[in-house]
Amino acid sequence: MKRRSSFLVFLGLLLASPLALANDQHTVSFGYAQTHLSSLKNSDSKDLRGFNFKYRYEFNETWGMLGSFTATRNEMENYTWKEGKLHKNGSDSVDYGSLMFGPTYRFNDYVSLYGNAGIATMKFNKHSKEDSFAYGAGVIFNPVKSISIDASWEASRFFAVVDTNTFGVSVGYRF
């Protein structure tokens, strides 16, 4: 997952570089993401934590496109108490990733909204894997012309019973 995540981020940066020569506005942002799984409601397990990378291209003063890549993970150690000692039973891991695209709408120099849709992947213990439709929305603030602050939400459903909600906050550079 780490190798694939690194490759996708590198590929996104590589593909975005020629676009930077155009006169239009671009924003690249990076931040924190946290995924909550509905199946963990009554569990001691923690939410998945990771990162979010976004690239925004504005066609004109109002409309643009946004691409988003999210990767979160959690690894849990399993222990049992046997014969007065604590024994490690192994570990479980959950990986979540999404790649989404969608339109952006700029209300003024400071506030933009966006919606996006794409594909998400969830993997349990490197064995059980499923792809699913993902969708999301977010708001982007530009407190100054070259800085963006983004708050996002995305959702998906896996294995017909596991709902995911991913929340993200990122900071970006607008050029």
Model-derived segments and spans:
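Cleavable N-terminal export/targeting peptides
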Residues: 1-25
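Outer-membrane beta-barrel proteins
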Residues: 19, 56-61, 104-109, 143-145, ...
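Short glycine/proline- and aromatic-enriched beta-strand/turn motifs that initiate or cap beta-hairpins
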Residues: 20-73
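Repeated loop/turn-to-beta-strand initiation elements of outer-membrane beta-barrel proteins
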Residues: 26-28, 61-67, 110-113, 141-151
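Outer-membrane beta-barrel "beta-signal"
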Residues: 27-29, 105, 137-142, 146, ...
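Hydrophobic, lipid-facing positions within transmembrane beta-strands of outer-membrane proteins
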Residues: 28, 49-53, 97-101, 133-137, ...
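Transmembrane beta-barrel strands of outer-membrane/channel proteins
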Residues: 28-34, 67-71, 115-119, 151-155, ...
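Flexible, solvent-exposed loop segments that connect beta-strands
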Residues: 34-47, 70-95, 119-133, 159-162
